[in-house]
């Protein structure tokens, strides 16, 4: 008797027709579980107040970001890992406390080349990655310690270029802040030899165009876009296309910031339109946040073409403090997530989350196994269920300050033992120091914070005295005199 192969029936003409029909109706099996595209949008010095959906101030206009929140998730307790640009970006991009890499502040840069970034983690899952806008993880004029260790008296291009995005896993890049960009593709999407490109147009529009150009050339994905808007950071600009007549009586710096934020919002809207046009909007996970809170500097309204280190016109309302502080206004920022059809729409999530969680969440979304080196957590199962995470503590160390948040409680330490304890859920403005009335809670969080600092480089609570800025800020925001530098 002729043997019949057990799979032969599927090759019957009618079976083949059915398989072909199913292929075109349902698509290939792999497509159902195709990893999502991932976009991380980081603004620069954007304060907690400055999205319309936050409901904190009346003058802000961000319709596209508000729509993103309504179609996704707004995290009301979103934190960065530092109240300053470079260390915050190092923590976000690696998913690890940046102090594990020896970075407490900007002078501790550059990001070590052996640090593993989100782009490098996603590469084994087939992702193509692009970095756009502000990088700020390379050596610069204040990284004196690194320069001394490497025998460098004055930085030259050959000292800096090895620390650009290509060295950290990015296949494509349009790196720059304002008028000059280091790029390996053009704004029409065509590849080019790596080199410097001058741009005369408004920086936010250029950075949006660079993101759109990359996405347009990679419609099949999966891709990872790390889009870093240099806004509303100083030096401020007030592009007429984004100014609104209703702002004319506001401080000049506030007007400029509002117009720059409107430009970011417009860019986010353009990205959404492009994703929809390419049929990618339901398979793209998007994060939106800031690198730290707004620098307020007493709200001094100097002309926008002066005082580059002053107030950037943004606001942290209703939070206490500003950029450079481990007060809420320095480290708590806008934090949105969207993944249409996957994450709930219109959710307000109140449990603390961190930019550390972006790497772990991206890892999980890409189908990669958990990495025990990551300090963040995968937010997807929590957000899908609307559940709080198992109790965890978030930590910070910056200048002479240390902080920890566990649940509703926050510990803050500055200098040699000035301590504060706040119930952040009840007191987001950090007005009521409960250190004296809650000694057990104070002791617990202090011990946790100290144990965490023992894992860092260098270990322990900061030993340096408060710097002149801290010596001004803590009396101003907390009503406590602290000793500054001798």
Task: Show where each model-derived region lies.
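Post-cleavage N-terminal segment of exported redox proteins
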Residues: 3, 28-31
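Formylglycine-dependent sulfatase
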Residues: 31-415, 419, 428-447, 451-454, ...
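Generic cytosolic/nucleocytoplasmic N-terminal low-complexity/intrinsically disordered segments
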Residues: 1-2, 19, 36, 440
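Catalytic Cys-His active-site segments of thiol-dependent hydrolases/isopeptidases
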Residues: 423
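Bacterial N-terminal signal peptides
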Residues: 15-27
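Bacterial N-terminal signal peptides that target proteins for export
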Residues: 2-17
């Amino acid at each position: 008797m002729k043997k019949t192969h057990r799979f032969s029936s599927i090759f019957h003409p009618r079976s083949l027709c059915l398989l072909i029909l199913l292929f075109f109706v349902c698509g290939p099996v792999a497509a159902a579980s195709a990893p999502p595209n991932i976009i991380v949008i980081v603004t620069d010095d954007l304060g907690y107040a400055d999205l319309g959906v936050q409901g904190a101030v009346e003058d802000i206009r961000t319709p596209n970001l508000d729509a993103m929140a309504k179609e996704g998730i707004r995290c009301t307790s979103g934190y960065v890992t530092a109240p300053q640009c470079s260390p915050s970006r190092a923590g976000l991009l690696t998913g690890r406390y940046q102090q594990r890499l020896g970075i407490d502040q900007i002078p501790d840069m550059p990001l070590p080349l052996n640090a593993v970034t989100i782009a490098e983690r996603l590469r084994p899952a087939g992702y193509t990655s692009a970095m756009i806008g502000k990088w700020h993880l390379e050596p610069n004029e204040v990284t004196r310690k690194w320069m001394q260790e490497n025998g460098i008296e004055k930085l030259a291009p050959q000292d800096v270029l090895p620390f650009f995005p290509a060295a950290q896993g990015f296949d494509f890049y349009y790196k720059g802040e304002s008028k000059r960009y280091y790029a390996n593709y053009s704004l029409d999407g065509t590849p080019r030899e790596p080199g410097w490109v001058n741009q005369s147009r408004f920086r936010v529009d250029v950075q949006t165009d660079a993101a759109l150009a990359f996405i347009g050339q990679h419609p099949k994905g999966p891709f990872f876009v790390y889009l870093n808007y240099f806004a509303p950071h100083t030096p401020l600009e007030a592009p007429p296309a984004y100014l609104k007549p209703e702002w004319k009586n506001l401080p000049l710096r506030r007007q400029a910031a509002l117009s720059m934020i409107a430009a970011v919002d417009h860019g986010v809207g353009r990205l959404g339109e492009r994703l929809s046009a390419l049929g990618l909007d339901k398979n793209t996970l998007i994060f939106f946040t800031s690198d730290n809170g707004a620098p307020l500097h007493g709200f001094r309204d100097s002309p926008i073409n002066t005082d580059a280190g002053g107030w950037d016109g943004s606001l942290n309302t209703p939070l206490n403090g500003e950029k450079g502080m481990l007060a809420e206004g320095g480290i708590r920022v806008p934090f949105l997530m969207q993944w249409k059809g996957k994450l709930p729409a219109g959710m307000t999530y109140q449990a603390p989350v961190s930019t550390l969680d972006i790497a772990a969440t991206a890892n999980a979304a890409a189908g990669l196994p958990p990495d025990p080196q990551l300090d963040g957590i995968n937010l997807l199962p929590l957000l899908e269920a609307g559940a709080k995470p198992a109790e965890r503590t978030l930590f910070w160390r910056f200048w002479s300050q240390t902080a920890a948040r566990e649940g509703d409680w926050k510990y803050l330490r500055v200098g040699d033992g000035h301590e504060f304890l706040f119930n952040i859920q009840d007191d987001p403005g950090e007005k009521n120091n409960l250190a004296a009335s809650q000694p057990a809670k104070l002791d617990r969080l202090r011990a946790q914070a100290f144990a965490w600092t023992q894992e860092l480089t260098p270990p322990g609570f900061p030993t340096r005295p408060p710097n002149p800025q801290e010596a001004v800020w803590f009396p101003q925001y907390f009503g406590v005199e602290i000793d500054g530098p001798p």
